[in-house]
Amino acid sequence: MSSKLVLVLNCGSSSLKFAIIDAINGEEYLSGLAECFNLPEARIKWKMDGGKQDAELGAGAAHSEALNFIVNTILSQKPELSAQLVAIGHRIVHGGEKFTKSAIITDDVLQGIKDSVPFAPLHNPAHLIGIDEALKSFPHLTDKNVAVFDTAFHQTMPEESYLYALPYKLYKENHIRRYGAHGTSHYFVSREAAKVLNKPVEELNVITCHLGNGGSVTAIRNGECVDTSMGLTPLEGLVMGTRSGDIDPAIIFHLHDALGMDVASINTLLTKESGLLGLTEVTSDCRYVEDNYETKADAKRAMDVYCHRLAKYIGSYAALMEGRLDAVIFTGGIGENAAMVRELSLKKLGLLGFDVDHERNLAARFGKGGNIAKDGTRPALVIPTNEELVIAEDAYRLTA
């Protein structure tokens, strides 16, 4: 067995994803999800040695109980896995301006993550809990914990991309600017695209679309991010599962002044009650929207708005490619599986030379990627993302 094993942790506010990955060859020895934290139904499920298992964590369980279960129950079944761990990689949603790349976790790094809590109030506190619990659970790896930031890849954006047209002192004094998200995924699929297209990364011009319950589009020119659709927070940009994406900011004042909604209620509306859920009034699940597009008005409405917004972003980012666009890339749960989203969106972009092959598009689902465009037209690639591998690679590289 390899001695390049890394434990990857992705702590959310009410869940914890985990995996043990060989950082050299990408082999996955363990993967799982603990969820429903602080609720009676808190539970954990995992895959190891080709088998699937699950268990209850106990009412009210959270990150501490989940990590204890991973260490004392799951890994006790395979002590050689635990013995061969060389590092722990932590996904961190927001690193502010301080972090342009992954970093070994020190007191200074922890402070930087804390300083970014206002920009990711649900995610960063959970990451800090996960780091603390990992340090307790794996004391022999205290100096081998690495933070991998979702925002780091976007730190190459030029000023004209990341500044808002607000009073400049809000940026200078309060760091209010665009940061983006999903950077680890955009980084991974762009590097995979370079291999597919047989181009050096530093010459690669692509537009990457990470589409899941959250979604973002990134313009990558000469291998570096030059713009991305998410902003100060992950609320800006595309239509998402429950998030509105771009709106006229004055809608907020109207909701407050004319409809009497308070700030907390407006925040809930924009982040948890909008997007596909708001448009269908039924669900945030894109599968419902796709399955019922031809027969239900709510599904058609949601799909059309979703694809219109996505096509607008792809089209506008094409203008940043300095005359050469190598491909558009789809990834994430929706990007990898929702053939209708890809086809309807690219159908609006014939001006850019996209022409989807219907059969290829249908075939590129459920873990299968490939070029879904017709021969002789601009490539449209489906590339399954692997953020966990990037986190494992960075953790191993920094601690080896």
UniProtKB/Swiss-Prot annotation:
Claim: Nucleotide-binding is one of the keywords in the record: yes
Which of this chain's residues are annotated to bind substrate? 91
Gene Ontology molecular function terms on file: acetate kinase activity; ATP binding; magnesium ion binding
List the pathway annotation. Metabolic intermediate biosynthesis; acetyl-CoA biosynthesis; acetyl-CoA from acetate: step 1/2
Q: What are the positions of the active site?
A: 150 (proton donor/acceptor)
Q: Which branch of life, at top level?
A: Bacteria
Give the Pfam families listed for this entry: Acetate_kinase (PF00871)
The protein's location, in the record's own words, is: Cytoplasm
Q: Which reaction does it catalyse?
A: acetate + ATP = acetyl phosphate + ADP
Q: Where is the signal peptide?
A: none
A Gene Ontology BP annotation from the UniProt entry: acetyl-CoA biosynthetic process
Residue sites binding Mg(2+) per the record: 10, 387
Q: Which residues bind ATP?
A: 17, 210-214, 285-287, 333-337
In the record's cofactor note, how is the cofactor described as bound? Answer: Mg(2+). Can also accept Mn(2+).
Question: What UniProt keywords apply to this chain's record, in alphabetical order?
Answer: ATP-binding, Cytoplasm, Kinase, Magnesium, Metal-binding, Nucleotide-binding, Transferase
Q: Where is this site: Transition state stabilizer?
A: 182, 243
Keyword check for Magnesium, yes or no.
yes
Assembly mode: Homodimer.
PANTHER family listed in its UniProt record: ACETATE KINASE
Q: What does this protein do?
A: Catalyzes the formation of acetyl phosphate from acetate and ATP. Can also catalyze the reverse reaction.
Name listed for the protein in its UniProt record:
Acetate kinase
- Tell me the name of the encoding gene: ackA
